[in-house]
Amino acid sequence: MLCFADLPSEIHHRIIFHLDSNRDVAALSSQCKALHSLCDMSNRKKYSRVRITPSISDLDRAFKMLMDILRRRSLGRYVRHIEYRQTISRYCQYDVKPYEPKLSEEDMRLLRNATQRAGFTRALQERVLNMLVRELVVGDRLYGTFSDTRAPATYVTQALTALLVSLSPNLESMAMMPTFYTNFDEDTADSFMHSECPLDLLLRETNENPVDKPYLQNLRRVYMINLGDDHSDDGRLYVAMDFIGCLAILRNLPSLEWIGTDALAEDDNVLPALGPKSSNVSCIAIHHSAVATSYLTPVIRSCRALKEFEYSIGGRGSVNGTQPTFNPKTFFLCVLEHKTTLERLDLDVESHIFSTVYRGPGDFEFDEEDGRAEAQAYWIESPPNSFWDQRGCLKDFEALKSLSIGVHFLLYFATGVNNENDDKIVPLVEYLPPNLEYLCIRGYEKGKRKRNDAQMDALKALLDSDSTSLKEIHGVDECIPNAEDIDFPDNYPDLLWKLPDEWSDEEE
């Protein structure tokens, strides 16, 4: 009988090429010496991940990887994750400086060809080349990083990242800071300054014209690193970042599924607008953040088919001690547009909902702040009347399998909006989504409200009856607390959320 190891090497190559995980390839390589050689595990591990920061050691490592790939293009297929960490604190035109020709003529030819393949031509090509070799200029360095002038660091890190992205056809995930400069201080309609930043230009061009590009075709996940303007995040407060602007320059990438961030506060930028159903993104995760419903609305509505949405507050203090408005009705209408596709919804926001003391559906009056009237009067682009006139309730979410939510918000979802149940209390067990398998309820305390106790007892009885798709319920027998802002962050450092800074060459 023919075994796998006896198959022709061409078939082995094809199988290995389609394995996403290095761990799977490593397991395959252990089967025999021939497969071990084909799997090339040492190079797979070495080139699978790269981090680009203003640190000279990181830049040297990334530049060496770039040259290795240019000399042996097959190495670029191993790159699966790229992290870019550099802020753009202000716009400054790139200052071309002469460089010492330490690279060979052949290496310079390879660099020149690579910049051209990445779409940089004519004068811009020469500037990008200058950025790539500028790291050899001693005068730019200070204490192991680039000098306080942010422009050189920004351009060098962006040029390196852009070239590595363009040479990595199997790139699946990125973690990066915003690639563009936004002037938060000037009240102008043109919030985006002209950009010469190579990574920003590469992303924008590919987003606008993704067809026939040999790069960014397999990128599925992007995490936006939120360290603030000029790395201003001190770890205590929510941080303003133009998340909408970041989504706008990524949304058309053909394989992009997931985008997320943490510690997000609203920025002052109002451009560009996100039109409805304009994004390929289907999964959004915004955690430890504080933004209003007016901010989340265009993000959610931009998805052509939303499958997963996660939003949580807490872990930081607010900038001025106030909370952004979270309007449950407006939010419900946003996700109701995706009732046939939404599979997972995770919300930990009840502490930001005004009038959260729930006595009955009629106690919720959410037509004012971030509601229909205010949106139509003050939002830059208010949803149409058809959005506000939607009718629906929790059981209309036919694709929903996993739901994590505060107890009061859950009961509000069950009642729904613009339907015959307005001002009524409905039995939760009769309004669950038909395919729900997992339910996590936050903030429920047994004995605090008899009406809620009866609803939770009915849920437990339903689970025991085996007549439901529901397989797990959490937060009924034990209280799962709602997330909250940290009112005095200096007094509670252990409660503050921090961005993990772990890095290794091991695949996640």
Task: Describe the predicted segments one by one.
Residues 54, 84-88, 176-181, 223-230, ...:
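Concave beta-strand-loop units of leucine-rich repeat
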Residues 15, 69, 89, 336-508:
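Leucine-rich solenoid repeat modules
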Residues 119-139, 226-234, 313-324, 348-381:
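Acidic/polar low-complexity surface segments
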Residues 2, 12, 41-46, 60-71, 74-81, 155-163, 167-173, 212-221, ...:
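Leucine-rich repeat
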Residues 2-267, 281-282, 436:
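N-terminal adaptor/linker regions at the entrance to substrate-recognition repeat cores
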Residues 298-313, 323:
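Acidic, serine/threonine- and glycine-rich low-complexity intrinsically disordered segments
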